[in-house]
Structures are given as structure tokens and as C-alpha cells.
Amino acid sequence: MERAPPDGLMNASGTLAGEAAAAGGARGFSAAWTAVLAALMALLIVATVLGNALVMLAFVADSSLRTQNNFFLLNLAISDFLVGAFCIPLYVPYVLTGRWTFGRGLCKLWLVVDYLLCASSVFNIVLISYDRFLSVTRAVSYRAQQGDTRRAVRKMALVWVLAFLLYGPAILSWEYLSGGSSIPEGHCYAEFFYNWYFLITASTLEFFTPFLSVTFFNLSIYLNIQRRTRLRLDGGREAGPEPPPDAQPSPPPAPPSCWGCWPKGHGEAMPLHRYGVGEAGPGVEAGEAALGGGSGGGAAASPTSSSGSSSRGTERPRSLKRGSKPSASSASLEKRMKMVSQSITQRFRLSRDKKVAKSLAIIVSIFGLCWAPYTLLMIIRAACHGRCIPDYWYETSFWLLWANSAVNPVLYPLCHYSFRRAFTKLLCPQKLKVQPHGSLEQCWK
């Protein structure tokens, strides 16, 4: 997001003299430094373009990603991709030579697109945070709206409209309203660059309000998860069934890992809410064993039933055979099985929500780290008209801001199992076919 002429970085004196620009922008870099900076900028461009292109290709390759909340991640990837494909490449020769050589018309277009994309990235992060907030605090109504793709598209379009309205009209019309352009020949930056009142208003809408919003959403998610965890633990102590003294101890089903998948050794395991109460799914056997499964329903099992359990897992009571009437003990067992199923399902959902809060905290923290320096320096610089902030600090701050577009796609495979699996499908399709459960870890090593 280029907001200033780069002469302060190019010229040893740090002045914005029009004579230097007219002379071609004397560079303050040696040939070696120019090569190093060009290589770093090229690396940032490649990382931004390839990373976000991979996110977009994942939507084409994996139809399971096309949910409402993931459409917002796609919208963010489109913004970041265009930053790397259009905004940064046009700025590289400008920052290395100190002179804009692409004409006034392309300068206007570049500024509009640059401000638009960076603002849309911010608003997309707010939208993603709000969507996760609804998924945790209003889960029932949220799940009912998951199939409404048009609602998601409307929200995505609204993000782009608001992002354009924030800076676009000002960039296009400022020079006509003020009676002429104040930008020297060979430079390209917004006319309002030193207007403190406009910048403080725009910064409030572009950074301070969004940052407070995502902080509120994530704090609400965290508090909601904490409350639900506390209620689950209290409920387990009050109403949890006691296993019989002769029952064999069995570890509970492993919760999802931080990647959202089962650990090694549990490749076939699935949460119990995928099965009916009357079906024996993975994890039910462990629950039955912990609760003392068998016809005795709490009494010592006979040698026959004990050996049968050891060889075939926990069996259903004989009274549950087809055509027979369930006994009181079998009804009690079914009730306890249902309680175990509900407990494991709730534990799975809490683990999923904790993962959501963790991933959002990472995204928001990086967002604040990348945007706060630029926003604060922009306001201070405008207040003192560029005399109190060294130009290289300002230059560094918005390169840090651009780096956020390269970092965002890295967060998806780290925090979202669905994206990680889609990336594996694109990058390691053979491993995914041969080892569908264990290939994710191997592919990303």
C-alpha cells in the first residue's frame, strides 16, 4: 500500500525536492543493496501470489470447502493475490529508482486499486471474525444458514463496495475539488497524503474500528468457550455415571488435534454424533467398556462374556437381540451410552471451537502487528507534515503491511484442517490416495 513518495528512502538527504525527481531520482543505494532489495521484493511477490493462488485453487479442487465461512477466506485470498500480482510489482521500480515512470493515469489506477485491496483485506478479516463469532455464540441459526451461498456473496460484495468508498472517491476527485494537483512530476501518491483530518477519519474506519471489532469478537468467543467448558465439567461432576468397580479402565476417545484431525492411531475414529445411539460406531466401544458393558450391567461378568469382550470388543446385551424385549439393565445401558455419546460430541465441539478461537487469535495478532505501525506513523507523519518521522521507518511500515498479504495464506493450512487437506490434494495427490489418513503430516514435513 504505497502512501508516500519514496525519495526519503532513495535520497541521503531525505528531502522531497522536485529537482531530484526531475533529474531521475538519485538513488542512495549501492548496486549490491539494490540487488538485495530487488531480490527480497521479488521473493515477497512470489510468496504472495503463489500462496493466495493455492488458496483459490483449493476451492476449485475441493468442493467441500465451498461453505459460507470459507467463501470469506476466499474473498481475503483474492484481495491478497491482487496485492502481490498488481500493487507490489508496480511499486518496485518506483522505490528502486525514486521516480514514477508509468504516467499519471496508471498512477491513479494503481492508487485506487492499492487502497481498495488493503482496505478490503481489513474488512474481510472483520467479516471472518464476525462469522466465527456467530458460529460459536449462535450455533443453531448459523448452521441453518450454511447452505445460503447468496447471503455470503452479498456480504463479500459489500466488503468491496465499502473498501472502495473509503478511499476511491477521494483519490479520483481530490485534485478537482482542491483546484489542482499538488503531486510533483515523476511521483505517485494520494493528494490527501498530508491532510491530517482526512487520514485520522480514514484510519479510524480502516484500522481502529476493525481492530476493536475483531478483538471483541475473539474475546467473546474465548469467554463463551470458557463458560461452556466450565458447565461441562460441572455437569460431569454432578451427573456423570460411575463405572462399576470391576470394569476394565479404558481411555476416552482422543479429541481432535490442533489440526482438526485425529492423532495417529485413530485414523478410523470419528465423533459419535455421526452415529445413532443404537449404532456401534468408533468410540462407542470405549464408552461402553468404561461404563461396564455386558449383560450384567454393573455386576461381575461371567467368564464366557468376559472372554467374548476381550476378543470381539464389548458386546450388546443378549436381551437386545432381534425379537426380544429390552430388560431394565439394557435400557440403563442404552441411557448411559447416550450420555457418553452426548458428552463426547460436546467435547468434540468444544475442541473445535477452541481451535477456531486459536486460529482467529493468530490471524488477528498478525493483523495488528502488520497494520498498527503503518497506521500510527501515517497519522503522526501527517500531523507534522513529514518532518518528525524518518522516511525509512515509514517505508518499512507499509512493506510490513504488504507482508500481511503473504502471511495470510500460510495461516490457513496451519489452523484449518479442511484447507490443509485441500492443499495436500493439490500438492501430494498420490500420498493422499495411498494413505488417506496419515499423509497430511508426511506431505507437510
Curated annotation (Swiss-Prot):
Q: What is its main location?
A: membrane
Positions of glycan attachment:
N11
Q: Which UniProt keywords apply?
A: Cell membrane, Disulfide bond, G-protein coupled receptor, Glycoprotein, Membrane, Phosphoprotein, Receptor, Transducer, Transmembrane, Transmembrane helix
Query: Compositional bias (Low complexity) at which positions?
Result: 300-312
Q: Name one Pfam family in it.
A: 7tm_1
| Subcellular location(s) of the protein | Cell membrane
Question: In which domain of life is the source organism classified?
Answer: Eukaryota
State a GO cellular component annotated for this protein. Answer: synapse
Query: Which cysteines are cross-linked by disulfides?
Result: C107-C188
Cytoplasmic compartment segments: 61-70, 130-156, 218-359, 418-445
**Expressing tissues:** Expressed abundantly in brain, most notably throughout the thalamus, the ventromedial hypothalamus and the caudate nucleus. Isoform 1 is largely predominant in all tissues.
GO annotation terms (biological process): adenylate cyclase-inhibiting G protein-coupled acetylcholine receptor signaling pathway; cAMP metabolic process; chemical synaptic transmission; cognition; drinking behavior; eating behavior; G protein-coupled receptor signaling pathway, coupled to cyclic nucleotide second messenger; learning
**Region entry Disordered, spans:** 234-259, 286-336
Q: Ranges of Gly residues compositional bias?
A: 290-299
Question: Its biological function?
Answer: The H3 subclass of histamine receptors could mediate the histamine signals in CNS and peripheral nervous system. Signals through the inhibition of adenylate cyclase and displays high constitutive activity (spontaneous activity in the absence of agonist).
One further remark on this entry is: Proxyfan acts as a potent neutral antagonist while thioperamide, ciproxifan and FUB465 act as potent inverse agonists.
**What is the recorded name of this protein?**
Histamine H3 receptor
Upper classification of the organism: Eukaryota, Metazoa, Chordata, Craniata, Vertebrata
